[in-house]
Protein backbone atom coordinates (compact mmCIF):
# COMPACT_ATOMS: atom_id res chain seq x y z
CA UNK A 1 0.00 0.00 0.00
CA UNK A 2 1.25 3.49 -0.84
CA UNK A 3 1.85 5.95 2.00
CA UNK A 4 -0.40 8.72 0.70
CA UNK A 5 -3.90 9.04 -0.70
CA UNK A 6 -5.41 11.92 -2.64
CA UNK A 7 -8.16 13.91 -0.93
CA UNK A 8 -10.20 16.78 -2.25
CA UNK A 9 -12.92 19.29 -1.45
CA UNK A 10 -14.63 20.66 -4.56
CA UNK A 11 -17.13 23.52 -4.63
CA UNK A 12 -18.74 25.57 -7.35
CA UNK A 13 -15.70 27.82 -7.76
CA UNK A 14 -12.59 26.08 -6.46
CA UNK A 15 -11.12 22.59 -6.16
CA UNK A 16 -8.86 22.05 -3.14
CA UNK A 17 -6.65 18.96 -3.28
CA UNK A 18 -4.20 17.52 -0.77
CA UNK A 19 -2.37 14.39 0.33
CA UNK A 20 -3.56 12.29 3.26
CA UNK A 21 -1.17 10.09 5.21
CA UNK A 22 -3.07 6.79 5.18
CA UNK A 23 -1.64 5.66 8.53
CA UNK A 24 -2.19 8.84 10.56
CA UNK A 25 -4.80 10.82 8.61
CA UNK A 26 -2.55 13.89 8.55
CA UNK A 27 -3.29 16.28 5.67
CA UNK A 28 -0.45 17.95 3.78
CA UNK A 29 0.45 19.68 0.51
CA UNK A 30 -2.97 21.32 0.14
CA UNK A 31 -3.43 23.42 -2.98
CA UNK A 32 -6.42 25.28 -4.39
CA UNK A 33 -7.24 25.41 -8.10
CA UNK A 34 -9.82 27.55 -9.86
CA UNK A 35 -12.41 25.26 -11.36
CA UNK A 36 -12.95 27.71 -14.19
CA UNK A 37 -9.42 27.05 -15.47
CA UNK A 38 -9.89 23.32 -16.11
CA UNK A 39 -12.26 21.34 -18.34
CA UNK A 40 -12.83 18.57 -15.78
CA UNK A 41 -12.11 17.40 -12.26
CA UNK A 42 -9.89 14.67 -13.68
CA UNK A 43 -7.77 17.31 -15.40
CA UNK A 44 -7.23 19.13 -12.08
CA UNK A 45 -6.28 15.89 -10.34
CA UNK A 46 -3.74 15.06 -13.05
CA UNK A 47 -2.14 18.50 -12.70
CA UNK A 48 -1.91 18.10 -8.92
CA UNK A 49 -0.37 14.62 -9.10
CA UNK A 50 2.12 15.76 -11.73
CA UNK A 51 3.14 18.73 -9.59
CA UNK A 52 3.69 16.66 -6.46
CA UNK A 53 5.35 13.57 -8.00
CA UNK A 54 3.82 11.21 -5.42
CA UNK A 55 2.55 7.71 -6.12
CA UNK A 56 -1.15 7.62 -5.26
CA UNK A 57 -3.52 4.69 -5.75
CA UNK A 58 -6.44 5.73 -3.54
CA UNK A 59 -8.54 8.86 -3.39
CA UNK A 60 -11.61 10.48 -1.89
CA UNK A 61 -13.13 13.70 -3.21
CA UNK A 62 -15.91 15.63 -1.47
CA UNK A 63 -18.22 17.52 -3.81
CA UNK A 64 -20.96 20.06 -3.09
CA UNK A 65 -23.81 18.16 -4.72
CA UNK A 66 -25.94 15.05 -4.10
CA UNK A 67 -24.14 11.77 -4.83
CA UNK A 68 -26.73 9.18 -5.83
CA UNK A 69 -24.90 6.86 -8.23
CA UNK A 70 -21.97 6.51 -10.60
CA UNK A 71 -22.75 9.64 -12.62
CA UNK A 72 -21.96 12.91 -10.84
CA UNK A 73 -23.16 16.25 -12.21
CA UNK A 74 -22.15 19.20 -10.08
CA UNK A 75 -24.90 21.59 -9.04
CA UNK A 76 -22.96 24.86 -9.39
CA UNK A 77 -20.44 23.86 -12.06
CA UNK A 78 -20.37 22.37 -15.55
CA UNK A 79 -18.22 19.41 -14.47
CA UNK A 80 -19.87 15.99 -14.81
CA UNK A 81 -18.25 12.55 -14.77
CA UNK A 82 -18.54 8.80 -14.18
CA UNK A 83 -16.84 7.74 -10.94
CA UNK A 84 -15.91 4.33 -12.38
CA UNK A 85 -14.47 5.85 -15.56
CA UNK A 86 -12.40 8.44 -13.68
CA UNK A 87 -11.09 5.76 -11.32
CA UNK A 88 -10.00 3.67 -14.31
CA UNK A 89 -8.44 6.63 -16.13
CA UNK A 90 -6.40 7.60 -13.06
CA UNK A 91 -5.33 4.02 -12.37
CA UNK A 92 -6.67 4.16 -8.81
CA UNK A 93 -7.49 1.11 -6.68
CA UNK A 94 -10.11 3.04 -4.72
CA UNK A 95 -11.91 6.28 -5.61
CA UNK A 96 -14.63 7.53 -3.30
CA UNK A 97 -16.80 10.51 -4.28
CA UNK A 98 -18.83 11.81 -1.35
CA UNK A 99 -21.08 14.76 -0.52
CA UNK A 100 -19.28 17.74 0.99
CA UNK A 101 -21.20 17.51 4.26
CA UNK A 102 -20.56 13.79 4.46
CA UNK A 103 -16.90 14.80 4.50
CA UNK A 104 -17.45 17.49 7.14
CA UNK A 105 -19.31 15.00 9.35
CA UNK A 106 -16.52 12.43 8.99
CA UNK A 107 -14.01 15.08 10.08
CA UNK A 108 -15.64 15.40 13.51
CA UNK A 109 -13.98 12.32 15.10
CA UNK A 110 -10.62 13.71 13.92
CA UNK A 111 -11.02 17.21 15.35
CA UNK A 112 -9.08 18.38 18.39
CA UNK A 113 -10.32 20.78 21.09
CA UNK A 114 -8.49 23.69 19.51
CA UNK A 115 -10.57 23.19 16.36
CA UNK A 116 -13.84 23.84 18.21
CA UNK A 117 -15.63 26.71 19.97
CA UNK A 118 -18.51 25.65 22.22
CA UNK A 119 -21.83 27.51 22.47
CA UNK A 120 -23.64 26.25 25.54
CA UNK A 121 -24.72 22.82 26.66
CA UNK A 122 -22.73 20.27 28.64
CA UNK A 123 -20.22 17.64 27.52
CA UNK A 124 -21.07 15.43 24.51
CA UNK A 125 -22.23 11.89 25.28
CA UNK A 126 -19.84 9.36 23.76
CA UNK A 127 -21.41 7.09 21.15
CA UNK A 128 -24.55 9.20 20.70
CA UNK A 129 -25.61 10.66 17.32
CA UNK A 130 -24.05 13.87 16.03
CA UNK A 131 -25.51 16.56 13.75
CA UNK A 132 -23.56 18.95 11.55
CA UNK A 133 -24.87 21.85 9.51
CA UNK A 134 -23.43 24.94 7.95
CA UNK A 135 -24.35 28.00 5.96
CA UNK A 136 -22.32 29.10 2.97
CA UNK A 137 -23.49 29.38 -0.62
CA UNK A 138 -26.22 26.99 0.51
CA UNK A 139 -27.17 25.15 3.71
CA UNK A 140 -25.53 21.76 4.21
CA UNK A 141 -26.74 19.14 6.70
CA UNK A 142 -25.58 15.67 7.74
CA UNK A 143 -25.71 13.36 10.75
CA UNK A 144 -23.10 10.97 12.09
CA UNK A 145 -23.64 7.79 14.10
CA UNK A 146 -21.20 5.27 15.59
CA UNK A 147 -22.04 1.63 14.81
CA UNK A 148 -19.82 -1.42 15.40
CA UNK A 149 -16.61 0.61 15.75
CA UNK A 150 -17.35 2.47 12.52
CA UNK A 151 -18.56 6.00 11.91
CA UNK A 152 -21.52 6.13 9.55
CA UNK A 153 -22.44 9.44 7.94
CA UNK A 154 -26.10 9.99 7.10
CA UNK A 155 -26.13 12.51 4.26
CA UNK A 156 -29.23 14.21 2.93
CA UNK A 157 -30.61 17.49 1.70
CA UNK A 158 -31.81 18.82 5.04
CA UNK A 159 -31.13 22.39 3.99
CA UNK A 160 -34.17 22.17 1.73
CA UNK A 161 -36.72 21.42 4.44
CA UNK A 162 -39.42 24.05 4.92
CA UNK A 163 -38.48 27.27 6.71
CA UNK A 164 -40.51 27.01 9.93
CA UNK A 165 -41.09 30.45 11.51
CA UNK A 166 -41.73 30.55 15.25
CA UNK A 167 -42.37 34.25 15.88
CA UNK A 168 -44.50 37.02 14.44
CA UNK A 169 -41.45 38.60 12.77
CA UNK A 170 -40.39 35.30 11.20
CA UNK A 171 -43.95 34.70 9.96
CA UNK A 172 -43.90 38.07 8.19
CA UNK A 173 -40.55 37.17 6.61
CA UNK A 174 -42.03 33.90 5.34
CA UNK A 175 -45.08 35.67 3.89
CA UNK A 176 -42.96 38.17 1.96
CA UNK A 177 -40.50 35.59 0.63
CA UNK A 178 -43.26 33.15 -0.32
CA UNK A 179 -44.90 35.87 -2.42
CA UNK A 180 -41.58 36.36 -4.22
CA UNK A 181 -40.18 32.86 -4.69
CA UNK A 182 -42.89 30.34 -3.82
CA UNK A 183 -41.53 27.55 -1.64
CA UNK A 184 -39.30 28.93 1.12
CA UNK A 185 -36.78 26.38 2.34
CA UNK A 186 -34.45 26.81 5.30
CA UNK A 187 -31.64 27.46 2.83
CA UNK A 188 -33.50 30.52 1.55
CA UNK A 189 -32.79 32.24 4.87
CA UNK A 190 -29.73 30.35 6.19
CA UNK A 191 -27.04 30.98 3.57
CA UNK A 192 -25.22 33.91 2.01
CA UNK A 193 -28.12 34.58 -0.37
CA UNK A 194 -30.44 33.83 2.56
CA UNK A 195 -28.99 36.69 4.59
CA UNK A 196 -29.79 38.98 1.66
CA UNK A 197 -33.34 37.58 1.59
CA UNK A 198 -33.75 38.35 5.29
CA UNK A 199 -32.52 41.91 4.83
CA UNK A 200 -34.79 42.53 1.84
CA UNK A 201 -37.84 41.07 3.58
CA UNK A 202 -37.23 43.18 6.71
CA UNK A 203 -37.08 46.37 4.63
CA UNK A 204 -40.08 45.45 2.47
CA UNK A 205 -42.14 44.63 5.58
CA UNK A 206 -41.78 48.33 6.45
CA UNK A 207 -42.97 49.34 2.96
CA UNK A 208 -39.52 50.60 1.95
CA UNK A 209 -37.24 49.72 -0.95
CA UNK A 210 -34.18 47.61 -0.03
CA UNK A 211 -30.74 48.48 -1.33
CA UNK A 212 -28.94 46.10 -3.65
CA UNK A 213 -26.62 44.66 -1.00
CA UNK A 214 -24.40 41.59 -0.96
CA UNK A 215 -24.01 39.32 2.09
CA UNK A 216 -20.65 40.94 2.87
CA UNK A 217 -22.23 44.41 2.84
CA UNK A 218 -24.96 43.35 5.26
CA UNK A 219 -22.48 41.76 7.66
CA UNK A 220 -20.12 44.75 7.60
CA UNK A 221 -22.91 47.28 8.19
CA UNK A 222 -24.39 45.17 10.96
CA UNK A 223 -21.06 44.87 12.76
CA UNK A 224 -20.39 48.60 12.33
CA UNK A 225 -23.90 49.30 13.65
CA UNK A 226 -24.40 51.63 10.69
CA UNK A 227 -27.62 50.04 9.38
CA UNK A 228 -30.51 49.01 11.61
CA UNK A 229 -32.01 46.77 8.92
CA UNK A 230 -28.71 44.94 8.41
CA UNK A 231 -28.30 44.43 12.14
CA UNK A 232 -31.84 43.05 12.40
CA UNK A 233 -31.15 40.71 9.47
CA UNK A 234 -27.95 39.37 11.03
CA UNK A 235 -29.62 38.99 14.43
CA UNK A 236 -32.50 37.09 12.86
CA UNK A 237 -30.05 34.91 10.93
CA UNK A 238 -28.44 33.86 14.23
CA UNK A 239 -31.82 33.12 15.82
CA UNK A 240 -32.99 31.01 12.87
CA UNK A 241 -29.65 29.16 12.93
CA UNK A 242 -30.44 28.32 16.54
CA UNK A 243 -33.95 27.12 15.79
CA UNK A 244 -32.72 24.96 12.92
CA UNK A 245 -29.93 23.45 15.00
CA UNK A 246 -32.39 22.67 17.78
CA UNK A 247 -34.62 20.92 15.27
CA UNK A 248 -31.71 18.72 14.19
CA UNK A 249 -31.00 17.90 17.84
CA UNK A 250 -34.60 16.83 18.40
CA UNK A 251 -34.86 14.80 15.20
CA UNK A 252 -32.07 12.32 15.97
CA UNK A 253 -31.39 12.93 19.66
CA UNK A 254 -27.92 14.29 18.92
CA UNK A 255 -26.47 14.11 22.44
CA UNK A 256 -23.09 13.64 20.76
CA UNK A 257 -23.28 17.32 19.86
CA UNK A 258 -24.39 19.67 17.11
CA UNK A 259 -21.58 21.08 14.98
CA UNK A 260 -21.65 24.21 12.84
CA UNK A 261 -19.46 24.37 9.72
CA UNK A 262 -19.44 26.69 6.73
CA UNK A 263 -17.79 29.99 6.02
CA UNK A 264 -20.40 32.47 7.22
CA UNK A 265 -20.57 32.31 11.03
CA UNK A 266 -16.79 32.75 11.64
CA UNK A 267 -17.03 36.17 9.95
CA UNK A 268 -19.06 37.55 12.86
CA UNK A 269 -18.03 35.30 15.73
CA UNK A 270 -18.38 37.83 18.57
CA UNK A 271 -21.77 38.97 17.26
CA UNK A 272 -22.87 35.34 17.09
CA UNK A 273 -21.75 34.69 20.67
CA UNK A 274 -23.88 37.60 21.93
CA UNK A 275 -26.89 36.78 19.73
CA UNK A 276 -30.07 34.88 20.50
CA UNK A 277 -28.64 31.71 18.93
CA UNK A 278 -28.50 29.49 22.02
CA UNK A 279 -31.83 30.72 23.40
CA UNK A 280 -33.45 29.87 20.06
CA UNK A 281 -31.70 26.48 20.00
CA UNK A 282 -33.34 25.64 23.35
CA UNK A 283 -36.71 27.27 22.55
CA UNK A 284 -38.51 23.95 22.14
CA UNK A 285 -41.48 24.36 24.48
CA UNK A 286 -42.11 21.16 26.41
CA UNK A 287 -38.79 19.76 25.16
CA UNK A 288 -36.60 22.64 26.28
CA UNK A 289 -34.97 20.44 28.93
CA UNK A 290 -34.35 17.71 26.35
CA UNK A 291 -31.99 19.93 24.35
CA UNK A 292 -30.65 21.98 27.27
CA UNK A 293 -27.46 19.93 27.75
CA UNK A 294 -26.76 19.23 24.07
CA UNK A 295 -23.54 21.07 23.20
CA UNK A 296 -23.13 23.13 20.05
CA UNK A 297 -19.69 23.62 18.52
CA UNK A 298 -18.40 25.88 15.80
CA UNK A 299 -15.75 24.12 13.69
CA UNK A 300 -12.74 26.41 13.19
CA UNK A 301 -10.45 23.89 11.46
CA UNK A 302 -9.09 25.28 8.18
CA UNK A 303 -9.96 22.26 6.02
CA UNK A 304 -12.63 20.01 7.56
CA UNK A 305 -13.64 18.81 4.08
CA UNK A 306 -10.13 17.50 3.37
CA UNK A 307 -9.78 16.05 6.86
CA UNK A 308 -13.14 14.27 6.55
CA UNK A 309 -12.42 12.98 3.06
CA UNK A 310 -9.26 11.41 4.43
CA UNK A 311 -11.11 9.92 7.40
CA UNK A 312 -13.81 8.45 5.14
CA UNK A 313 -11.22 6.87 2.85
CA UNK A 314 -9.08 5.52 5.70
CA UNK A 315 -12.13 3.87 7.26
CA UNK A 316 -13.06 2.40 3.85
CA UNK A 317 -9.53 0.94 3.70
CA UNK A 318 -10.01 -0.73 7.10
CA UNK A 319 -8.59 1.77 9.57
CA UNK A 320 -10.39 2.44 12.87
CA UNK A 321 -10.85 6.17 13.48
Swiss-Prot record:
Q: Which domain of life is it from?
A: Bacteria
InterPro entries tied to this protein: ATPase_NBD (IPR043129), Bacterial_glucokinase (IPR050201), Glucokinase (IPR003836)
Keywords per UniProt: ATP-binding, Cytoplasm, Glycolysis, Kinase, Nucleotide-binding, Transferase
Specify which residues bind ATP according to the UniProt entry for this protein.
Answer: 8-13
Record-linked Gene3D superfamilies: 3.30.420.40, 3.40.367.20
Of the GO CC terms on this record, one is: cytosol
Where does this chain mainly localize? cytoplasm
Recorded catalytic activity of this chain's protein: D-glucose + ATP = D-glucose 6-phosphate + ADP + H(+)
Q: What is its EC number?
A: 2.7.1.2
| Cell compartments where the protein resides | Cytoplasm
Instruction: Name a biological process GO annotation.
Output: glycolytic process
Single Gene Ontology MF annotation: D-glucose binding
Which family is this sequence assigned to?
Belongs to the bacterial glucokinase family.
NCBIfam families with a match to the protein in the record = glk, PRK00292.1-1, PRK00292.1-3, PRK12408.1
Q: Which HAMAP family match?
A: Glucokinase
**The protein's name in its UniProt record:** Glucokinase
Source species: Shigella sonnei (strain Ss046)
Task: Please state the gene responsible for encoding this protein.
Answer: glk
Amino acid sequence: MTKYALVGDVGGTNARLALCDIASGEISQAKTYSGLDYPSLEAVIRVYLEEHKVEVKDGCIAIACPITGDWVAMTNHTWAFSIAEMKKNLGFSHLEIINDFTAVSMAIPMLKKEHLIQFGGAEPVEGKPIAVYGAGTGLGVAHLVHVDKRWVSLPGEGGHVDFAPNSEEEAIILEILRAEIGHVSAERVLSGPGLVNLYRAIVKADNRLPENLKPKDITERALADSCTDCRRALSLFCVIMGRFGGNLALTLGTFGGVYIAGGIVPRFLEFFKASGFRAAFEDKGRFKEYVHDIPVYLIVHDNPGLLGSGAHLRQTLGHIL
